[in-house]
Amino acid sequence: MGGKAKILLVNGPNLNLLGRREPGHYGHHTLDQIVKELQDESTSSGVVLEHIQSNAEHELIDAIHATEAEFIIINPAAFTHTSVALRDAILGVSIPFIEVHLSNVHAREPFRHHSYFSDKAVGVICGLGAQGYQFALQSAISRLKAKSAEH
């Protein structure tokens, strides 16, 4: 890749409670631990990883609008099932993205089965815990390298 590619990692509401909140569904890793591991991996791959977590929808939208990233990894959390505005923000910037969920949303309550993002995502990873973020990052880096090789 010529220059350092950027990936924006977006984490939605309540993910700041990882490690304490319902560990049976979400695991014992904290968000800080997950982000640190991803930053280490991205740095070793020559990619810049920017991260935002917010419980406020408008802050996530503003970060997406302002990003210069070439790829987005997003765990919209509860906004998955409710936020047309967040969906529109991602579609508005035309940046490819992967949707990640720690738990298997399809094995949970029926209201969690619908996503406003999945139909537009490059891929969806759910139910693999914190490792799902690693898979998303590896895929994003691979796609960015392939895109760079084409140019």
Curated annotation (Swiss-Prot):
Site (Transition state stabilizer) location in chain: R21
A biological process term (GO) from this entry: aromatic amino acid family biosynthetic process
Database matches in Pfam families: DHquinase_II
EC number of the protein: 4.2.1.10
Catalytic site positions: Y26 (proton acceptor), H101 (proton donor)
Record field: catalytic activity: 3-dehydroquinate = 3-dehydroshikimate + H2O
Residues binding substrate, per UniProt: N75, H81, D88, L102, S103, R112
InterPro entries: DHquinase_II, DHquinase_II_CS, DHquinase_II_sf
Tree of life domain: Bacteria
Top EC class, one word: lyase
UniProt keyword list: Amino-acid biosynthesis, Aromatic amino acid biosynthesis, Lyase
Pathway field: Metabolic intermediate biosynthesis; chorismate biosynthesis; chorismate from D-erythrose 4-phosphate and phosphoenolpyruvate: step 3/7
GO molecular function terms listed in the Swiss-Prot or TrEMBL record: 3-dehydroquinate dehydratase activity
CDD domains per UniProt: DHQase_II
Family: Belongs to the type-II 3-dehydroquinase family.
Biological function: Catalyzes a trans-dehydration via an enolate intermediate.
Subunit field text: Homododecamer.
Protein name from the UniProt record: 3-dehydroquinate dehydratase
Source organism (scientific name): Shewanella sediminis (strain HAW-EB3)
Lineage: Bacteria, Pseudomonadati, Pseudomonadota, Gammaproteobacteria, Alteromonadales
